[in-house]
């Protein structure tokens, strides 16, 4: 009888302990969940250059997202000004202060693996954007790291198609020396950069595949900068003058600088007899304005909702969901990247209708 009482007592105590522990665990879980829901998600965007037209565009979009999601998310923005040491110091400081999501436009793409490794030690998810490594293997080892990027090959192809359409429809205006060869200047964003390489390669190969002979006059590396492009194209115009028949730029920032330089000499101001087709990539507001006025031929338009896509994917990473859950996008063949397609945008430079 005494043994039975002991067994019953021990059993009762065990049950009570289990119930208490379970209740405490449930309370802790509820507290943690509510805590996460009450706190706004802290997002830090680290940019190579916040004055870049595309980054200005993205920053405005993210600020709109914050306004429309008050209390849910807070964005902070850090400008490395092309300085790797500054960016590394900013990241280190923010990791120690506490952060929930990092959007990374890295200064030195060769430093990406080391930077991601450091960030993931804090269990902070990362979205890499605007610049990408030559191989996805740098990203693959990390569960909470994703690349959100565009298809640079497609962007180059669209540029080539726009130039081809212009040449085929208005060759008499473009082929100034009547040699049946398209003389062009290629404005390069960065040397040894995969995005620059693909955009340059596929724009020209598309033109050549259409049966158009080409000759490159110059291919300066301009670091994606408007003012550098303006001064460089100014100098190239003085050197080549009427030989320049098209300018193909790796992005809109440099294309804008090219248009500004040409306008100094009376080109691309609306006079149909003095036109040099200029194409860019991204679809930033200033480029769209130049295109709509007929001062720039066109651009490969980045999806204007890309900030929303990055936000949705980022929130999925923060809350341990499938990164593309609730979006219309899917991971590419690497399993660690989402590709946002470009669309062609042209204006009335040669009386085109805006597409």
How would you label these PLM feature ranges?
Residues 104-121, 126, 203, 217-288:
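Hydrophobic alpha-helical
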Residues 1-41, 117, 121-122, 353-354:
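Short, low-complexity disordered leader/linker segments with a strong preference
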Residues 35-61, 65, 69, 76-91, ...:
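Extracytoplasmic "Venus flytrap"
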Residues 117-154, 179-180, 284-290:
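Flexible loop/hinge segments that line or gate small-molecule binding clefts
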Residues 54-68, 155-159, 194-213, 232, ...:
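Short, solvent-exposed amphipathic alpha-helices that sit
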Residues 74-100, 218-240:
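Structural motif
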Residues 22-39, 180-191, 303-355:
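Hinge/cleft segment of the Venus flytrap/periplasmic-binding protein
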Residues 147-180, 229, 283-287, 303-321:
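Hydrophobic alpha-helical segments within soluble ligand-binding/sensing domains
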């Amino acid at each position: 009888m005494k043994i039975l009482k002991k067994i019953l007592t021990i059993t009762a105590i065990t049950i009570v302990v289990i119930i208490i522990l379970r209740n405490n665990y449930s309370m802790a879980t509820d507290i943690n969940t509510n805590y996460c829901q009450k706190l706004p998600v802290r997002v830090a965007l680290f940019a190579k250059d916040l004055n870049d037209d595309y980054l200005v565009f993205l920053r405005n979009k993210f600020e709109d997202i914050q306004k429309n999601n008050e209390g849910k998310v807070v964005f902070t923005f850090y400008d490395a000004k092309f300085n790797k040491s500054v960016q590394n110091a900013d990241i280190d400081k923010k990791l120690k202060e506490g952060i929930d999501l990092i959007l990374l436009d890295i200064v030195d793409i060769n430093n990406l693996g080391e930077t991601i490794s450091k960030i993931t030690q804090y269990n902070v998810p990362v979205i890499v954007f605007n610049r990408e490594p030559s191989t996805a293997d740098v990203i693959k080892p990390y569960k909470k790291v994703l690349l959100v990027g565009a298809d640079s090959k497609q962007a180059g192809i669209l540029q080539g198609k726009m130039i081809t359409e212009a040449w085929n429809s208005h060759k008499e205006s473009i082929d100034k020396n009547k040699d049946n060869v398209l003389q062009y200047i290629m404005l390069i964003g960065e040397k040894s950069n995969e995005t620059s390489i693909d955009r340059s390669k596929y724009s020209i190969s598309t033109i050549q595949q259409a049966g158009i002979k080409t000759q490159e006059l110059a291919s300066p590396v301009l670091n994606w900068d408007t003012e550098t492009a303006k001064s460089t194209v100014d100098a190239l115009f003085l050197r080549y003058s009427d030989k320049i028949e098209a300018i193909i730029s790796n992005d809109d920032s440099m294309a804008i600088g090219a248009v500004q330089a040409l306008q100094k000499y009376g080109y691309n101001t609306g006079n149909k007899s003095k036109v040099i087709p200029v194409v860019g990539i991204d679809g930033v507001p200033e480029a769209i304005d130049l295109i709509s006025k007929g001062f720039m031929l066109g651009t490969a338009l980045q999806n204007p909702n890309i900030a929303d896509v990055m936000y949705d994917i980022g929130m999925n990473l923060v809350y341990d969901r499938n990164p593309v859950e609730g979006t219309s996008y899917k991971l590419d063949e690497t399993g660690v990247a989402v590709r946002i397609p470009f669309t062609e945008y042209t204006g009335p430079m040669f009386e085109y209708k805006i597409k």
